[in-house]
Amino acid sequence: VPSRLTQEEANDVTLYAISLVGTPYRFGGNTPESGFDCSGLIGHVYKTRARVAAPRTVAALIDWGQPVPAPSLRAGDLVVFTQKGVTNHAGIYVGEGRFVHAPSSGGMVRLDALKSKYWSQQGVSYLRP
């Protein structure tokens, strides 16, 4: 599946996303200083590390990239969650079955496993920007 990102940019996106773990959650936030919501985190990381502008809402992310089958998932891809047909959350895949995201619960940017009890029960799509 083609990508807007070079391999180096995908690596930069991944490392930078991991470095933001612990940044506070803030609805509408899109900078490390203000805090992040999930789409704000994605937009900030892709803009600063790959010079690619991501949509500002999580609902718009579903149309932003190319669908990727789970076995082809690679670091820098997007993980997009859907509940009852509504796209409601997203994060950045960082490899080894893990993703970085800004959930409203927990109050900060976190690194979580896709196979965790909660996330494995959510509808998920994988996208390559």
Predicted segments with their positions:
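Compositionally biased, proline/threonine/alanine/serine-rich low-complexity intrinsically disordered stretches
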Residues: 1-19
